[in-house]
Design a protein with these regions (language model features):
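Second RecA-like catalytic domain
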Residues: 1-255, 259, 263
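A positional "C-terminalness" feature that preferentially activates on distal terminal regions of long
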Residues: 244-378
């Protein structure tokens, strides 16, 4: 998770979330104040639909309150039902994670001096996308995969009931009441990722983050592309169970980007002195006219970060638009397979990405499915 954060430039929030996953979250729930504590956590989660983002928002808000002085830090802890000792531990663990990344050459040395909090941990370049929740949540998905929850909404009309949730190999699960997402009826994304699942009277997920299909495709497991039929359509299959249908050019773009991510990480491991934040050269005219993914070798971390952000933004906006129009569509009953309705809904969400990614990744071609498939199979 931390290495993806370095690549996608959101080091401070991911280091904070990683610390909480390694230790515990800072929220407390006093007796007879459960409702107030739950409301405070939902307030910190805001519109992120993420328990993990709520943790980062809590730590960031507390640090800002402490810097303002006048006892604001103590008031913040009290008003938001937080543990000061846990917040301090998360601070310390996060600092250790950053120091390890610096020692390994993945981050530049920490700047000396300066007021505490004046510079985000890891430096400004390493946190260029730290305010982009779409990117932060995608990195959380990368770290927590394959802990994936499928979200199934009730019919085609808005419902007052929370959607049904299922995990592959386990079946139906429920969000624990302590989750900021518990009881929500409008989860815009068809999938969530989680860290802790506990079996008691039912299977309860204690912490979850809503993520789009594209985040799982980009940061999940093994991705296989297969020709889906006439017209250049391609089926992308993730780890043999999660499928999505896209246009051939879109599939070529996704496969190219995932390959470049792996190549850049391998290059960094091989050459620790490599500057991962050096500006990327412009894509050459030769590459811009080619569908071959492996010819993207002249684009480094900076281009990958920029292009991933654009693709994730598009994926999130498409899901939001679809939710606004349809008020929800069915997803998988069992996370191990996709129904016909699910496939059509997913295709409808992602087909508009074809033109977007063709422009964003500068892949030429006018819908030649066979050429794109040849590129994917190389």
């Amino acid at each position: 998770m931390l290495l993806w954060a370095v690549m996608l430039r959101c080091v401070e929030p991911i280091a904070t979330i990683a610390a909480a996953l390694s230790f515990k979250d800072p929220f407390v729930c006093p007796l007879h104040k459960q409702h107030a504590a739950d409301a405070a956590k939902r307030r910190l989660a805001a519109a992120s639909l993420s328990d993990h983002c709520a943790v980062y928002n809590a730590v960031k808000g507390w640090e800002a309150a402490v810097r303002s002085g006048g006892g604001a830090g103590d008031r913040y802890v009290h008003d938001n039902f937080l543990s000061r000792a846990t917040l301090q531990m998360l601070q310390s663990m996060r600092r250790q994670f950053i120091d390890i990344l610096c020692s390994a050459g993945f981050l530049p040395p920490s700047p000396a001096g300066g007021a505490p909090g004046a510079i985000m941990l890891g430096g400004s370049a390493a946190n260029e996308n730290s305010s982009q929740e779409d990117v932060v949540k995608a990195v959380v998905a990368a770290g927590l995969y394959p802990n994936v929850i499928a979200v199934r909404k009730h019919g085609g009309r808005p419902s007052s009931r929370p959607p049904r949730l299922s995990v592959r190999g386990i079946g139906r699960v429920e969000l624990h009441p302590k989750s900021a997402l518990a009881g929500m009826t409008a989860l815009l994304q068809p999938y969530m990722v989680y860290h802790t699942l506990v079996r008691s009277s039912a299977c309860f997920v204690h912490d979850a983050t809503c993520v789009p299909m594209m985040a799982l495709v980009l940061f999940g497991g093994k991705l296989v592309a297969q020709q889906a039929g006439a017209g250049g359509a391609v089926t992308l299959t993730l780890d043999g169970w999660l499928t999505v249908h896209v246009a051939a050019d879109s599939a070529a773009c996704v496969m190219a980007l995932t390959q470049r991510m792996q190549h850049c990480l391998q290059a960094k491991f091989t050459t620790p002195a490599l500057d991962v934040y050096a500006p990327s050269p412009p894509v050459s005219a030769r590459v811009a006219q080619s569908n071959l993914p492996h010819r993207y070798g002249d684009s480094g971390f900076a281009a990958i970060s920029r292009e991933t952000l654009q693709l994730l933004r598009c994926s999130f906006s498409l899901a939001r638009a679809a939710a606004a129009v349809t008020h929800g569509s069915a997803t998988t009953e069992d996370a191990g397979s996709c129904s016909d309705d699910d496939s059509r809904a997913t295709t409808a969400h992602l087909q508009p990405v074809q033109g977007f990614v063709t422009r964003t990744f500068q892949i030429g071609g006018g819908g030649g499915g066979s050429d794109a498939m040849d590129a994917l199979n190389e």
